[in-house]
Amino acid sequence: MSDNSSNQFLLLLAAAQQQQQQQLLQQQLAKIQKATASSPSKSTNGTSASTSAVPSTSGTSSSQNEAAQLQNLAKMQQIQQLAQFGALMAAQKKQQEKAAADKAKEKEKEKQKAAAAAAAAAAKASASTSSASAIPGLSPEMLAAWQQAIQMQALQQMMMTPQKSQMEEAIKKMMDMAKKKPAGVASTSSASTSSSTPSTSSASITSSNNNAANNAASNMMNNVMWQLVAAQMQQKQQQQQKDTQKKADQAKKAKELAKQQQKEQDVKNKQQEEILKFLMAQHQLNHQKKHEKKQADAAALAAKVLAAHRAALESDSPEEGKKTNEAMLRLPLQLGWRRQTCVRSIASAGVKGDVSYFAPCGKKLSTYSEVVRYLTKNSIHYITRDNFLFNTKLVIGEFIVPKQTEADETQQEREFAMFTEDDINKELTRLNVLKFVPKIQASTSNGVHEDDIKMSKIEEPDEPLDPSELNDEFTEELVHSQIMSNGVDECKIREREADDLLVNINDVRHLPDFSRIGNQCLSSQGFADALMVHEFVQNFGHVLGIDLEIAPKLESLCAGLDGDANHAEQTLQLTRQLLRLALEFPGMGNEKRFGQGGGEMGLDRENFSEVMRLFLIDKGKRGEELSQPLLTCNFLSISPEQKASILAFLCDELVCSRNVVTEIDKNLDEISRLKGEKWMREGKARALRSARSKKKNDEKVVVVKEEQNHESDSEPPTRPDTPKKATVAPPTVVSVSPVSAAQQQQRKFTPGLGQCEVLTEQEESMSLQQMDSLIGDLHQEAQNINQKIHDTGLKIRSFPFGTDRFHRNYWMLAHTDKVIIESLATTSVNNPACNANEYASKDPPTLEQRVPGACETIDLDVIACVEDLVDDVVLLRAKADKKTRKRYRRIENHMKRGWWTMQNRDCVESLRSCMLSRGIRERALHRLLTKPWFLNELKFGTITIEPVGEKSDLELVRRQGWTRLNTAIDKLQCHLKMSDVSKPLPSITPFETQKPIVVPPTMALAQIVKDDMAWKVIDEEVDGQELDETIIRQKIIETADMVQPKFWRPKFQKLEDQDTCQLFEDWKSYVSTEAQTTSQLMVALQTLEGMIMWERSSREALCQICKSMDGDEMLVCDGCESGCHMECFRPRMTKVPEGDWFCQRCREEKSGRPMCMFCSRETGNLHQCQRCAYHVHQECSQDGPKEAINPETFICGHCQEMKQMRFVKRLILRSESEERELEDDNHAENGENTKNGHMNGMNGAIAIGVHNQQNGVKGNLKRKLEVPSIGGLPKNMNKELCQLMLDELVVQANALPFLEPVNPKLVPGYKMIISKPMDLKTIRQKNEKLIYETPEDFAEDIELMFANCRQFNIDHSEIGRAGISLHKFFQKRWKQLKYNFTKRLRRLHR
């Protein structure tokens, strides 16, 4: 049910109730009117019937009383209704006032009081009107008030109902009562009328009239009531709408207010959060500022100390150094420390006494050890031991002077007075003044002797001291009296020193335990040698031609030395490179056991160990000791420590190498240059500081002068100067003598190192801030240069930067980025003071000697524990006989051997805190570890050696060595059979006995020398089958027996009066019994090959002019079987001479006259070459312009070229591994062509010789060498060939004019003469673009370049001579490279 419907029901209920009450009132009024109407009739009829009036009078009076009571009751009901109406009106107003939230409570109370008063007044007024009206009917005003009261009563009931359901029930009950009441009323009214009718006879008439009147009145009242109800309902609806709107507005305002309050609350919360965050940030910022301020203060103090140290180091004058030291010593006093000196005596030389320091907490410190201990305990880092001084050289702090009292002279009781620095300085000044004043003998008239003078009473220190009192106080008597107590003082000093020693002994802290090097597989000495090899290779490998990317690192090197299969090959390659370099320089001696020195042999995989042994034997006693293990086994089979020692020895030998010495000299020059740069910057900084201080002083003088001028201007002009102002010194003006001025002018214009101390005009005109900035920049540059000096110095030499109590060295190396600590086992091998034999007579190596390899995995700490147990037993036995007792170890066993590293900077701090300040070694190390610049250079970390996994199978390596040796013997025998050096066999055909055509040069054993990949520990391509050593030895001797005696060199040839050659027999004995390893047998086999004169063989003939076998055609002498290229003659020989041909040497021997080896003429000015002993003409041996020849030092051009070619050949053999010969796996007995290109070429050469013989041409007269030809080279190989030729051309000394294209601006007319310019740069660009398809295309451009040179330049010009020399080199070298690449291509095609 809605609010409107409920209001309508309430109004209807109120109207029904009001109607019922009206009916009741009308009935009562009708009764009253009847009563009033009957009273006059009775009075008029009373005269006629007087006798019967008595009973009627009594009835009338009773009816009047009832009417009065009914009127009073009606009036009371009206008054009650009016009161209820007033109460309802007050309640409604009160609710309206409560709904208005914007009105104040005080106004609400006043309105409630006013409403209550108005209601009471209305009730009184209504009562008075009702009581005053004696009319029996209702007035319209009362009727309207009554209607309003009835309505307000219904409204009050509606408002007082708490719930909706209860209100509906109440409405239903009231409706039912309204329906029942009219019937009851009607019955009562009818009863009353019926009862009253018998009373009078006229009542029926009156009642009918009254009923009509009552009906009319009731109808009128109903109409008025319904009008009032409609108007009231309309007003109520309007009021409800207003209230609803008002409530909606209030709810909206309340929501807006709530939102606004919520927003305000959120804003407040945000503000509170921001304030809280701000407070927290402010607190954190304050805390951070305090921390930063604390750090800044500590940094400032440290900077101040560091600046004082630096100023002390940089100060040139002693005065500045003294001031700086004094400032450093005053720093603790500024921080709250006290320095107190107990004075024993004062003289002109200074103060003597005992110095003590008092910390801020009050603790007294009397020695350096106590100070250091206190600083370490309290973590004070901004001051150090250097800020304290326990002698009295400087007058700093407080001074306590003892004095004697005059009260009791016998007991010599002493009191003390406190003196300040100023007092002591005044006294010292007085004594120094008195020292130079002539002494005046004191008057003795008073009878007092000088010795009897007593020391006067010392006044308070605040008062000025009287010089006479001080003179009396510190007289010679005081000194004399103190002499008596010198003995006591000396005893106290000794006791104090003993106490200090005891304190130091008791407070000795154990050094921290550093981390050992992980997976240590070498002994201490072995790791030391490996570390030295690693540093040497990393430092000088780039100048020795060692590839540092391939070279093993320290971890891999140690594992490879221990025999790890994964790293053994890298170690073997490094060993080979070091040995090869050592053989080149410093080389070996000239001792030759079998006619051939070790340096003359090639270095290959098999003779490696024996060549190394021969090299070590040649290097003195140390080398002989290292070579002993190689006498019975190969290099790979010796112990890791022996390998490391040999590698270290090779590095020591290479230090004297030319390249290493040059690198060291270059580094020394670089250090000298850097020191000069640093000195110049420091000198410039000193000059700037001096100029800055001078400018600052000048500015101060100018300010003082301006102030003086201002004061003088303010004074009267007639006033004379006072003596005080007259004594004021004018601005300081340095008087410069003419000599010094001339020197300064000369320094300004004289360049050199002194120039850095001379400022330019621009520098002198700088401001103080600019000077400070420039000084800072110079200081930073000096520090950077100092770092470079340090890094460069590490490349030259490395020294340990400190030693501790265990004699352990601390290393900082250039290429090991960790601090390494070396133990006693390697640092003090030759130091008798800490000899390991004195500490422990027998160390664990004895166990290793008994059981080899059993102690390899024993940890060093375990060894130390075992040694401790052994030491206890030894010490117990030593106590038996004190006379024979020996001094045993004072060093802990676990510190004796091994290597350690520092993990981080905390290790430095812990190490520094545990060091002894009085230790000889640790004091220096501690001083260095406290310097910040040194700590910044240290690098920390750990080193872990690669774990040793599977080791190489040495037995398999040994078997493969014998297999390779057997292969080499087969190769040599095959080569002997294919040449005419071996003895003839019965199966040789007649045409094979004749001289065949010469084949390309190939040495049999050279085929064993493979590229770098062949240097493997275990070669998978080599069969490791077991061979009988006796058979191998016998096979080598049989190979020697195959050589014809005429091909032996003189050392292996027997003399005419002897049956055998003794050297040859010694060689056989060496092969049979003495040689114990495959390497030694390989050297013997190479010696055998070297003793054969291969050049006497027609197939191995060398050109006597160019000393090579490369060439197109070669003529072989029919007398000595030596060969000469046809192209080497001057002029060039184009045809093969008919008949027998003899070389120049055979002709000279026959005729006895010298002959030119080029042109074969005897005439002309001949010169003998000091190298090849041939006679040549100058014009034949030299191309281009002729130079003056010194006969004593003359060397022909071919010999000079041969020397250069040998050097180039060595370079090629190092870099070009493919140019070496491959092995021949097939045997020559099978009759098949071998895989080697030389053997194929040999068969082809024999076939050519047979064909020429069948054609009737003499094979012994025509010695032609055909270059092996094959199809065109691949593009990559062609490019590589051209690139190699270009690289060799560029490095030549005469290649400078041909490196770049000719500039037409610099050389006018060049393009007019040369139509097709060409240079090496253009050729290189074309080669990189793969323009050259064949080598001939490349050679055409090279020839074009030299043709242009000959066309534009004359032969005698500098460029002409350079072109001729370079062209000649190109022609020879190009043939060799083409031949090598052709052979390589043939091997690829097989």
UniProtKB/Swiss-Prot annotation:
Subunit structure comment from the entry: Interacts with set-6.
Family designation: Belongs to the WAL family.
Name assigned to this protein: Bromodomain adjacent to zinc finger domain protein 2
Pfam families, sorted: Bromodomain, MBD, PHD, WHIM1, WSD
Gene: baz-2
Chain intervals with Basic and acidic residues compositional bias: 243-269, 705-724
Tissue note: Broadly expressed in the nervous system, including head, body and tail neurons.
InterPro entries named among the record's database cross-references: BAZ2A/B_Bromo, Bromodomain, Bromodomain-like_sf, Bromodomain_CS, DDT_dom, DNA-bd_dom_sf, Methyl_CpG_DNA-bd, WHIM1_dom
Mapped zinc finger ranges (PHD-type): 1100-1149
Organism encoding this protein: Caenorhabditis elegans
Disruption phenotype: RNAi-mediated knockdown prevents age-related decline in the expression of bas-1, a serotonin (5-HT) and dopamine synthesizing enzyme (DOPA decarboxylase). RNAi-mediated knockdown improves behavioral performance in pharyngeal pumping in aged worms.
Reported function: Chromatin reader protein, involved in positively modulating the rate of age-related behavioral deterioration. Positively modulates the level of global trimethylated 'Lys-9' of histone H3 (H3K9me3), but not of H3K9me2 or H3K9me1. May repress the expression of mitochondrial function-related genes by occupying their promoter regions, working in concert with histone methyltransferase, set-6. Involved in modulation of the mitochondrial unfolded protein response (UPR). Negatively regulates expression of bas-1, a serotonin (5-HT) and dopamine synthesizing enzyme (DOPA decarboxylase), with aging.
Region (Disordered): 30-67, 178-215, 235-269, 705-729, 1218-1241
PROSITE patterns in UniProt: BROMODOMAIN_1, BROMODOMAIN_2, DDT, MBD, ZF_PHD_2
Subcellular location: Nucleus; Chromosome
Coiled-coil parts of chain: none
Classification via Gene3D superfamilies: Bromodomain-like (1.20.920.10), Methyl-cpg-binding Protein 2, Chain A (3.30.890.10), Zinc/RING finger domain, C3HC4 (zinc finger) (3.30.40.10)
Sequence ranges assigned to domain MBD in this UniProt record: 323-395
Top-level taxonomic group: Eukaryota
Record field: compositional bias (Low complexity): 46-63, 186-215
GO cellular component: chromatin; nucleus
Compositionally biased spans, kind Polar residues: 35-45
GO molecular function, one term: DNA binding
GO biological process: epigenetic regulation of gene expression
Key words of the record: Bromodomain, Chromosome, Metal-binding, Nucleus, Transcription, Transcription regulation, Zinc, Zinc-finger
Start and end residues of each Bromo domain: 1273-1377
Statement: the UniProt record of this protein carries the keyword Zinc-finger: yes
Claim: Zinc is one of the keywords in the record: yes
